[in-house]
Amino acid sequence: MKRLVCLVLVLVLAGCGAAGEETLSTASALTVECLTEEQDFGGFTASPIADGESAELLVRAVLARYPTGFADQWGRGQILLVSDLRGTDRFTGGDYAGFTQRVGDGWRMVLDGDRLTAGTIHHEIAHILDGLLTEAGVLTEADWMALCPGGFSYGPEQTLYPDFFVDEYAMTDIREDRARTFEEAIRRGPGAYADAPALWLKLEYFSRAIRTHFDTTLWPEKTVWELGLE
């Protein structure tokens, strides 16, 4: 969440248009929209983005790397491009580039278009998948903790276990651990965790849960994240 941090639907990437309501479009689609007025999302606030074209192009390019029809299975969703994303309440003091939240029976991904990276998008996609897989019961805390050092518990200001975690941020929360493991595997590419057996096992477990839950009929033998298992 903090980064510099279902149904079979038809994927429609709408152009960057007006957005900001607290409900999602009733259309069965994933839309990409631009915030047009100041908004408080509950935990985060954001300003309108002056020009979201380059950010929208990056979002399209990232989504194109995922298997055909995959995003269609995430449910109704909205990717909202904003500017000056700020944390409030318990999120104060952080530098945020994006977050995801539930909106009714759908989801919303809010991205700061002024400092957007492909890694941030992959990271937030991992959060969406995490939620769906956890709800479906194919991803469990017990199974994941078995892949961590004995006696470990998530929290701030810990000594890094480089063999088990991508970075210190991954050690703060179980969901951030999964998102960073997924994101970094895509960034590094083939053989991402060849020299890190514990991270390889985490990616393998997350990847297996994804294939268990989703329809993979149109998928390649190896997805963009599974290349990290080579």
Q: Where do the PLM segments sit?
A:
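Positively charged n-region of N-terminal signal peptides that target proteins for export
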Residues: 1-4
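C-terminal motif of bacterial Sec signal peptides marking the signal peptidase cleavage site
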Residues: 12-15
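Bacterial signal peptide processing site
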Residues: 17-19
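Ser/Thr/Pro/Gly-rich low-complexity linker/stalk segments immediately outside membranes or between
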Residues: 22-27
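Acidic/histidine-rich, surface-exposed loop or edge segments in extracytoplasmic proteins
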Residues: 32-50, 162
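Zn2+-dependent metallopeptidase catalytic core
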Residues: 50-77
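Active-site-flanking segments in enzyme catalytic domains
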Residues: 74-230
